Amino acid sequence: MSKKASILVIQGPNLNLLGTREPDVYGKTTLEDIHQKLGELAKAQSVDLSTFQSNHEGELIDRIQKAKQDGVDFIIINPGAFTHTSVALRDVLAGVAIPFTEVHLSNIHQREEFRKHSYLSDIANGVICGLGAIGYELALQAAIARLQR
């Protein structure tokens, strides 16, 4: 990588409640813990990492649009419940054409029927689900490897 790579981690609705919300489904790790670990891993690889969480679809869309202006090279996104409902998130991700990985803490395919469909997965570079918080670390490793090609 000639310039320092820039990776944005986007967290959707209710992920600010990690650690306390349904820990049997999502684990006990907090969002702050996840972001801290990712920051350490990114720093060790000389990668710029920024994070953003919102419970509001429009704010997520605005941040993704800004990512294009900011020159972000890769996005890691856990869209939360918007995975199953948001054509608008799909459209903005397709529109900015920044490669991205979709991450889910739980295995969405083992859950309720309505959670089994993702509006994003067919345009994502990859999907990681069901591995808990380590899924974010794997997504970061994959993003860095892709950017180093």
Swiss-Prot record:
Pfam families reported for this sequence: DHquinase_II
UniProt-annotated site: Transition state stabilizer, residues: R21
Signal peptide feature range: none
Stored Gene3D superfamilies: Dehydroquinase, class II
Known pathway: Metabolic intermediate biosynthesis; chorismate biosynthesis; chorismate from D-erythrose 4-phosphate and phosphoenolpyruvate: step 3/7
Annotated GO biological process: amino acid biosynthetic process; aromatic amino acid family biosynthetic process; chorismate biosynthetic process; quinate catabolic process
InterPro entries, A to Z: DHquinase_II, DHquinase_II_CS, DHquinase_II_sf
The keyword Lyase belongs to this UniProt entry's keyword annotation: yes
Active site: Y26 (proton acceptor), H104 (proton donor)
Top EC category: lyase
Record-level Gene Ontology MF annotations: 3-dehydroquinate dehydratase activity
Keyword 4Fe-4S: no
Reaction(s) catalysed (UniProt annotation): 3-dehydroquinate = 3-dehydroshikimate + H2O
Protein name as annotated: 3-dehydroquinate dehydratase
Source species of the chain: Polynucleobacter asymbioticus (strain DSM 18221 / CIP 109841 / QLW-P1DMWA-1)
